């Protein structure tokens, strides 16, 4: 069972009460460049998105289609890092305190960064949830990441 954060719970409860659907959007962090990528996130927020999924750029984004893979590569070429992605999330949180923010990425970026450090930093940035596309459930690594995220009330989806 996925336990959502208070912000995500509130978003879904409000939508359910109004019998409305959620608008959940996606962008690749730092694409086409860091500044423009943040402006895209702000425009998405202004357009009525309830939750925004911010992709952590990865060289081998195998779970994504070819267009998103190319955007990942372009972002990395332009110098996007996990720290910069977290900074973008933080700026987006400051811009819209009500927006649900979810980081989506691959486990080796998180392991290289450090699971505890990652959980703490994204908590400070105001991230609500993490989707780790290549992390199997019920393995040691999933339990370790989930435990660190729960400590900071961040959902692992």
Question: Model-predicted segments: where are they?
Answer:
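Catalytic cores of alpha/beta
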Residues: 34-46, 117-118
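Glycine/proline-rich, positively charged
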Residues: 103-119, 123-134
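Conserved beta-strand positions in the central sheet of alpha/beta enzyme cores
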Residues: 24, 50-53, 131, 157
């Amino acid at each position: 069972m996925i336990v959502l954060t208070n912000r995500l719970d509130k978003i879904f409860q409000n939508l359910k009460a109004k019998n409305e659907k959620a608008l959940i959007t996606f962008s690749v962090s730092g694409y086409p460049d860091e500044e423009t990528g943040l402006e895209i996130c702000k425009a998405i927020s202004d357009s009525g998105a309830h939750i925004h999924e911010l992709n952590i750029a990865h060289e081998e984004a195998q779970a994504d289609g070819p267009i998103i893979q190319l955007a990942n590569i372009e972002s990395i070429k332009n110098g996007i890092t996990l720290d910069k992605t977290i900074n973008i999330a933080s700026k987006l949180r400051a811009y819209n305190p009500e927006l649900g923010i979810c980081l989506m990425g691959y486990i080796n970026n998180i392991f290289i960064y450090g699971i505890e450090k990652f959980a703490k930093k994204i908590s400070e940035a105001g991230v609500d949830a993490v989707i780790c596309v290549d992390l199997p459930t019920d393995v040691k690594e999933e339990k370790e990441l989930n435990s660190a995220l729960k400590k900071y009330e961040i959902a692992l989806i």
